[in-house]
From Swiss-Prot:
The modification Phosphothreonine is found at residue 198. Induction: By stress conditions e.g. heat shock. The keyword ATP-binding applies. It comes from Shewanella amazonensis (strain ATCC BAA-1098 / SB2B). The keyword ATP-binding applies. This is Chaperone protein DnaK. Residues 604-617 have a biased composition (Low complexity). Residues 604-637 are annotated as: Disordered. Residues 623-637 have a biased composition (Acidic residues). Keywords: ATP-binding, Chaperone, Nucleotide-binding, Phosphoprotein, Stress response. Acts as a chaperone.
Amino acid sequence: MGKIIGIDLGTTNSCVAVLDGGKARVIENAEGDRTTPSIIAFTEDETLVGQPAKRQAVTNPTNTFFAIKRLIGRRFKDDEVQRDVNIMPFKIIQADNGDAWVESRGKKMAPPQVSAEVLKKMKKTAEDFLGEEVTEAVITVPAYFNDAQRQATKDAGRIAGLDVKRIINEPTAAALAYGIDKKQGDNIVAVYDLGGGTFDISIIEIDNNDGDQTFEVLATNGDTHLGGEDFDNRLINYLADEFKKEQGLDLRNDPLAMQRLKEAAEKAKIELSSTNQTEVNLPYITADATGPKHLVVKVTRAKLESLVEDLIQRSLEPLKVALADADLSVSDINEVILVGGQTRMPKVQEAVTNFFGKEPRKDVNPDEAVAVGAAVQAGVLAGDVKDVLLLDVTPLSLGIETMGSVMTKLIEKNTTIPTKASQVFSTADDNQSAVTIHVLQGERKQASANKSLGQFNLEGIEPAPRGMPQIEVTFDIDADGILHVSAKDKKTGKEQKITIKASSGLSDEEVAQMVRDAEAHADEDKKFEELAQARNQADGLVHATKKQVEEAGDALGSDDKAKIEAAIAEVEKAVKGNDKEAIDTATQSLIEASAKLVEIAQAKAQGAQSSAQGSSAEKTADDVVDAEFEEVKDDKK
């Protein structure tokens, strides 16, 4: 059986790890980096992922996608999506089913389809390291992801050719990474996870009992639209406003300028974690009738902190809720772990320290801990790690809509999963022959204020006065946090079941089509690579042949020379096209036409060898020097 890999599919960066000799190991990608930017670019010829995509973003902003995780499993009309529509350089559109999709070069794509490109890169990275095919993975998601977002993440895995064995919450994975080597005593750990696009807080109890470890999540909370991208956007808007004040031009209307501004803002934010002041200097950022314009703005750490102060405060509210849900106070927390790149900001660390009254641990790598934890969970599923039990929770309450548009909860938030709950309901009207089961996720009493996960009908109920029929509704949450619902008429035994797909989401047919597209792309990519190799080989041969023609000089007859030059022209023409066979044929013809050059080169080499031997014999004879000796007599002294 092949290895199960652990993947942290992040908003800004992704990371892959695997159990290697009993230890979780983060794998370096083809560029030699331990994390890969979650950036995907579509050019005319190919799909770029990671650093290569990031490098060309400035020149291709409308086809370069980043922070796609913020759109996954979301509706176009969601407030969070609408906030991003106006600031992203790429096009976010409404799909036919109401989901948020993106568009590149006239092609509409679902976020799972785009995220699948990052997962494919992670899969390939692991395969290159292991030297074998990888088909199974554990993928992490923010703890506060709802059912639709979890489903969409699984879909992305399927499109990438991966069987997703488990979806695991990011803070839980980080706690696994932290606690796996610490076998002494029991600990209550708070994991504060502020990543590129999402924020989670989880309170986790780690019990150690005779070498066996139990990781039990006591409570979780968060905000799936709060992260480093929001911090970047505050700085981007500040820089754009400063430029507008000075030059009277709004850079927000120029995607190219905004992409440069985004890169500069991200760099400045990172620099301000270790220095008190930096300068954002972008020459030729734009131009008007009077000529080119340059952006030069000094930014202090204090200024950045004032721009994002409310975002940091926003992250503290879920901490209070999580502690209350776990029925704990701040003093009950033994350790605080920081996860996610944004936690490197000193002001964030200061806020967390002040809240918990203790310094967070510094021995956990905020960029890699989640992938390491996913690899540990993969080891548990594969049977390679025996003494670890993970008890995760559902982040939001689940229930159905009942009379008066009220949400009636069947499973409360922070219930340990997997779990099952049943409740008996009845009809609202006399002789009602069908009921609609409307499944909801959230904490509000009013049904419409919660997230609708889907609905289905149970039909064929026997006519009876209202309140008489007994309809048993059962909610069953699996270990991935994905919900299965059934409704049963207890009198007739009629039953209707569904696995909740978001009221939108991708159908099985759509996912299957995307898998086929991805496979077709793999063939396309292979063909493109082969074409590039053929072109390189042809170019190299043309260069070498021209050099040989020059070196042959008069030794090459005019007929042969004309033949070679004609063959070179054919190769140069073929290289400009996209027909690999034509390039190969032209290359072969040039090799055959250059046979005379090979003969001349060999003759020259033999001539050089024999002249070298002749000169060495002469040199031996010449080494005998004629000389006259004079007798020196003592009296000459």
